[in-house]
Swiss-Prot record:
Alphabetical list of HAMAP family matching this protein: UxaC
Family: Belongs to the metallo-dependent hydrolases superfamily. Uronate isomerase family.
Enzyme Commission (EC) number: 5.3.1.12
Protein name per the record: Uronate isomerase
Gene3D superfamilies documented for this protein: Metal-dependent hydrolases, uronate isomerase, domain 2, chain A
Record's catalysed reaction(s): D-glucuronate = D-fructuronate; aldehydo-D-galacturonate = keto-D-tagaturonate
Protein species of origin: Brucella melitensis biotype 1 (strain ATCC 23456 / CCUG 17765 / NCTC 10094 / 16M)
Record keyword Isomerase present: yes
Pathways per UniProt: Carbohydrate metabolism; pentose and glucuronate interconversion
A GO biological process held by the record: D-galacturonate catabolic process
Disulphide bond pairs: none
Pfam families: UxaC (PF02614)
Length: 466
């Protein structure tokens, strides 16, 4: 299983040699992780991870969705159900099931990330299998008890410079405060994710809004609601936040008059919003968040286009983030126009657009980001955060948007040990792409070195104000 030093590079010798040189120049750059879903309590408490299954299997919906697709119940993977049905609690049994089915992950990015962690973090070069499952489980479990495997030690070992978590608008951020108070040098910052108090289609929307204005100490009115967001954004900024994040079903925006927006708020806060009112409210709030970003400087990320909880049976029994979110088409040109008409020409605003609709990359997103000063393209995301996905992204966007209307790489992960693996993969694929441009005489090699550095490090640091 030993990692091949030429993985993800071209098989053509000349191009491969260029890629080697480029990668050598960026391989050891610090990691900027400006968007992700690791838990702030890890860094605050610095406790040992419990066991291999809890580290690699249970929290990783890339893993659990593949196993579920092959008929393995989520309970057998240790996922707790809402209805109290028993789920597997024996970490070794969960690991054995994972190991027995490891062949399912052939040619997937999950395999690349996992095997990178096995070798570079644990020193394990055997390919996982049913036969060696217990031995590898024991080897990992033994190392997890050691001080060098605590979250803060791994932060240094991974050469992370900054990492952003993703946090609800009403989160008190106590673990971020604990990190700051501890005097530890690690930079763990929050990102403002207000979806629960913005998505009027959620059954708990009204209660989330009440919680928001309660925490902020503002009245339950349209203006009070907006002031509550401003209050919380400032609270996040004082703890280092540089960005907000918005995971909406679509990229629809709106620019209503103050009166129309206030009346819309009065309708949706009653808790029985129509589908059209819920969509209009989300749309208006993207524009309001852009307005706030101009005032307070938070970089705005929009992650649209996921059909969340496509499998109602899984959602009802297990809740969110269980692998049943499916990409859907997204129409950026028309949906973003109200926001862009209002603020798209303002260089004080940075809106980073992500997509699960690859067909939109060359047709809509690259032309939009290649024109509007306020827009940047986020990297290949979620299902497409893979060698082929990143390569397609570069091929579909570079000719129209260039490199400098993109923002480098986000690992966007819940799996802490996959962070260096994901950055390694992105750097390798980008270097392979740049090597091809050099070999085709479309880019000079000295330029390729500069671009490789920018894609691996500078663009993320600059765009996210880190």
């Amino acid at each position: 299983m030993a990692l091949n030093p030429d993985r993800l590079f071209s098989a053509e010798p000349g191009t491969r040699e260029i890629a080697r040189r480029l990668f050598a120049s960026v391989e050891k750059l610090p990691i900027i992780s400006p968007h992700g879903h690791t838990e702030p309590i890890w860094y605050a408490r610095n406790e040992a991870f419990p066991d291999p299954a809890s580290l690699f299997v249970k929290p990783d919906h890339y893993i659990t969705r593949m196993l579920y697709s092959q008929g393995h119940s989520l309970e057998s993977l240790g996922i707790a159900s809402r209805d109290g049905r028993p789920s597997e609690t024996d970490a070794r049994k969960i690991w054995r099931l994972f190991a027995t089915n490891w062949y399912l992950f052939r040619a997937t990015p999950s395999r690349l990330w996992f095997e990178h962690a096995m070798e570079t973090v644990f020193g394990i070069t055997e390919r996982l299998s049913q036969e060696n499952a217990d031995r590898i489980f024991d080897a990992i479990a033994d190392q997890l008890t050691q001080p060098h495997m605590r979250p803060r030690a791994l932060y240094d070992r991974f050469n992370i410079e900054a990492i952003s978590t993703t946090d609800a608008a009403t989160d008190p951020l106590i673990y971020h405060d604990e990190v700051i108070a501890s005097g530890w040098h690690g930079r763990i910052i929050p990102a403002y994710r207000p979806d629960a108090a913005v998505d009027a289609g959620r059954p708990d929307f009204a209660s989330e809004v009440e919680k928001l204005v309660g925490v902020a100490g503002t009245p339950l009115t349209w203006q009070g609601y907006l002031d509550a967001h401003r209050n919380r954004r400032e609270y996040f900024k004082r703890r280092g936040a540089t960005s907000s994040d918005h995971g909406h079903p679509t990229a629809q925006t709106a620019d209503l008059s103050a009166g129309d927006a206030s009346r819309l708020f009065d309708r949706v806060i009653k808790g029985n919003a129509s589908t059209s009112d819920a969509e209009m409210f989300r749309a208006q709030m993207l524009t309001e968040m852009a307005r706030m970003s101009i005032d307070d400087g938070l970089v705005m990320q929009i992650h649209p286009g996921s059909f969340r909880n496509h499998n109602p049976t899984v959602f009802e029994r297990f809740g969110l983030d269980k692998g049943a979110d499916i990409p859907r088409q997204t129409g950026f040109v028309d949906q973003l126009k109200p926001l862009l008409d209002a603020f798209g020409n303002d260089p004080r605003l940075t809106v980073i657009l992500f997509t699960l609709d690859e067909t939109a990359l060359s047709r809509e997103l690259a032309p939009l980001a290649g024109h509007y000063p306020a827009l940047k393209l986020g990297p290949a995301w979620w299902f497409f955060d893979s060698p082929e996905g990143i390569l397609r992204y570069r091929k579909l966007t570079t000719e129209t948007a260039g490199f400098y209307n993109t923002v480098g790489f986000n690992d966007d992960t819940r799996a802490y040990l996959s962070i260096p693996a994901r950055h390694d993969m992105a750097r390798r694929v980008d270097c392979a792409y740049l090597a091809g441009l050099v070999a085709d005489h479309r880019l000079e090699e000295d330029e390729a070195y500069e671009v490789a550095h920018d894609l691996a490090y500078r663009l993320a640091k600059q765009t996210y104000k880190l």
